[in-house]
Swiss-Prot record:
Superkingdom, taxonomy of origin: Eukaryota
Protein's name in the database: Ankyrin repeat domain-containing protein 23
Keyword Coiled coil attached: yes
Gene3D superfamilies: Ankyrin repeat-containing domain (1.25.40.20)
Amino acid sequence: MDFISIQQLVSGERVEGKVLGFGHGVPDPGAWPSDWRRGPQEAVAREKLKLEEEKKKKLERFNSTRFNLDNLADLENLVQRRKKRLRHRVPPRKPEPLVKPQSQAQVEPVGLEMFLKAAAENQEYLIDKYLTDGGDPNAHDKLHRTALHWACLKGHSQLVNKLLVAGATVDARDLLDRTPVFWACRGGHLVILKQLLNQGARVNARDKIGSTPLHVAVRTRHPDCLEHLIECGAHLNAQDKEGDTALHEAVRHGSYKAMKLLLLYGAELGVRNAASVTPVQLARDWQRGIREALQAHVAHPRTRC
């Protein structure tokens, strides 16, 4: 039984007398259609021809729609056409609704209570209304807290500046003799503290218990305010009515940063308070108290492991 080789099929050589074993004659490969022999080559050629025709059509379309910019009218026509195309592509942007400021809605006079509340909440339009109507910037409540006190506590620096320009007293005292500097240190607002001190506020003011802003900055754990007070001339070893210095307070509250700053700037370790205790002894007593509490806890039968 004879078979046609691959080479014969590809080359198209004539084969004579090739008959299958089943009695069916096999036609001469040389007589087969030429499309069958050259099928892959012609398919590639047809694909290339098709791509060339598509490129040619695209080029013709481009040339037919191209503008010849021979004069200014042609250029204007091109610009108008581009604008028209852009309008179709990008929808027009909706205008944003106008929001009327609340200041215009407030027409009634602003009372003292509303004025102080506005200072705490930073509602400047109410402050402006109050001051425009001739209100006193130093007006206060029953505890002698002014708008400047509240603005300093809450950290509204622009409002602080506005009140100072309007004539607010920079060293106004509340019922505990605390000035706005105390309130700024209590809130930890360094920017406002700088504003007040630049306006001549007293850095070593004292309240009714003899504390200074330095004591307050230590108690409220605001080392940035503490350092600025020291740089502006705060007394490092100032004592309150209990005889405690800022270093005593730093030890008592366990504020490592405050202790480090005070010692770095030269705070004295040997100052005794009213109980004749120095900051060093206070630290030892504090450590001893912790140690005794831990030992008592461990010695308790219910807490043994």
